[in-house]
């Protein structure tokens, strides 16, 4: 029987960045092979560092998918745990070690007896940085194993063990990375009329772009435009020839994201025209679309867990965090939900330490749900 605590701790010690999860891949493959050694209805495929495990049903009418992400973050761990990260400047600070462990536990349970419907377990790389779900889909990694329904979870620090949360609409925002460069003409600070100051243009842009959310976005729908980085100039007495800005757009629907992207571009173009500077702009939504739950499947999941002892199912509002599972849910109907892990530190914090007691709880409750779906 899989030791959930030991498995999680082993995975916690080897966090790796997206598409570099080589030790993680090897550990998962070894564990999966052990779990499936007596299973005659299982097949395994790999795609780079990703892994797909397919359980063939006895009389399949559909395929049910379960997804777990496997990558870590470029964070120096500060938990002080005996099993802290062995990789410098790398940490499982978003709970993906928990996601993998739960998926392995579910695989073990579901491989005990052949289900009626097919089951796919996806161990997906590069959630944090490269939208690995999109990469796998576009590369054809699923083939004829593409699920008819897809499910996935994310740990949530501010919920207690036993609490789960989701909704029947959008759970996470879609994100879009924004890169902007204004190019003017450098010169001596004493003679600004002989130059064209890119820093001034960029400063006006940062101010003007605030109107996009306040004047173009329905406040009931909501959106975020944040520029967290601006770099211009080299010293105090030289007028900046270039100014670079790096920001993010977040919205709860793809239509709203496209509207905000359009307005950010228009504001940047207007600033460039009015100041007579050149503009380069890159809007990159990549694979981080809004995580839009299928209403019927979400209602089924929420109703199911409402009737399960020991589970408190919460109907929660959406969050502006991003998740690349949104790309897969744009292709396949499904549901994502929060799983409470009761820790005072937020996701991506160097002290994040979820409660391990959630592991047997999650495997027990979620395996029953999967058995219901697969039979």
From Swiss-Prot:
Pathway connected to this protein: Amino-acid biosynthesis; L-lysine biosynthesis via DAP pathway; LL-2,6-diaminopimelate from (S)-tetrahydrodipicolinate (acetylase route): step 3/3
GO biological process, alphabetically ordered: diaminopimelate biosynthetic process; lysine biosynthetic process via diaminopimelate
Protein task: Catalyzes the conversion of N-acetyl-diaminopimelate to diaminopimelate and acetate.
Family stated for the protein in its record: Belongs to the peptidase M20A family. N-acetyldiaminopimelate deacetylase subfamily.
Active-site annotation: 69, 128 (proton acceptor)
Enzyme Commission code(s) on record: 3.5.1.47
Designated name of the protein: N-acetyldiaminopimelate deacetylase
Entries under InterPro entries matching the protein: AcetylDAP_deacetylase, Amidohydrolase, Bact_exopeptidase_dim_dom, Peptidase_M20, Peptidase_M20_dimer
Organism expressing this protein natively: Streptococcus suis (strain 05ZYH33)
Keywords for the protein's UniProt record, in alphabetical order: Amino-acid biosynthesis, Diaminopimelate biosynthesis, Hydrolase, Lysine biosynthesis
Pfam families: M20_dimer, Peptidase_M20
